[in-house]
């Protein structure tokens, strides 16, 4: 019986620790796997304001908004914009526009990443594009 209680206590403790530290386990804004790739496409650094008044850093590559589709690129849960340089370079020979944004808490942006906040960031990026 003591063994079963011990296992339950350990299991509950692990669950509590996972709950407490879930944000730091899910989001890694300080991770840097940047290898020094040079950006081979011309970008404009943009600021996108969210509805909760956070400025997000973004990179916008515009060829022709009327003629070509626009890709909105959300970089994931780790690192910063520079970590995606090698991926963005694949767009250089494509007839597309693209916008990549850094989430709140990433690439020097204020705020902390949360699910609700990330949805807000994504909506703000799309609204910004529609207003061009």
Description of each model-found segment:
Residues 51-132:
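Membrane-embedded segments
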Residues 3-49:
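An N-terminal hydrophobic leader/cap segment in hydrolases
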Residues 1-4, 65:
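Short, Lys/Arg-enriched, disordered terminal segments
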């Amino acid at each position: 019986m003591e063994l079963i209680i011990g296992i339950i206590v350990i299991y509950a403790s692990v669950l509590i620790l996972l709950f407490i530290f879930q944000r730091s386990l899910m989001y890694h804004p300080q991770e840097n796997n940047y290898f020094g790739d040079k950006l081979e496409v011309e970008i404009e650094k943009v600021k996108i304001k969210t509805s909760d008044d956070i400025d997000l850093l973004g990179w916008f590559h515009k060829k022709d908004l009327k003629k070509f589709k626009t890709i909105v690129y959300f970089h994931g849960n780790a690192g910063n914009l520079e970590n995606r340089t090698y991926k963005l370079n694949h767009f250089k020979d494509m007839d597309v526009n693209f916008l990549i944004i850094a989430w709140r808490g990433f690439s020097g942006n204020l705020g902390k990443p949360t699910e609700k906040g990330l949805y807000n960031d994504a909506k703000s990026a799309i609204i910004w594009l529609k207003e061009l």
